[in-house]
Amino acid sequence: MTGILCVEEEGGILFHQRRVSRDRLLIDWIMKKIGEKSLWMREYSKTLFADYPVKIAEDYLAQAGSEDYCFIEDGSYTEYLDKITGLLLCRWRRHYPSDLKFQESILAEGWQLEAVYEVKGSSHENIMVEEWKKRKASHSCCERGEQ
């Protein structure tokens, strides 16, 4: 599954249980990027995607399949890091107050930056989107060679 998170320049996601920002053109870009794949989210995020078919569930991260995308606006993703194999990290490039932050330290633990996109926004001039993939674990340390 691929998680999609929108963060301000210090990693903030929410402030007093409200998103720190939003952008209509970024939503359009996300939907073009994922194509025909399913996009899961909780009820709170549904209004952002009113023009698109999305799947709604409070346990959306548990229900999403391996090829699905999840729009994440809470801290519950940390419980599903073993299931998440990709991230689209959308950076607002502005500072907004926040009290829930994305844990950037997880990216140093087996993740690789695959691509960076510049997205022209409606309320933000440019939004940087980083595409991260989880590196596959190498089992070479455990393999036995023939003698």
Q: Model regions: which residues?
A:
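Enzymes that bind and transform nitrogen-containing heteroaromatic metabolites
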Residues: 1-147
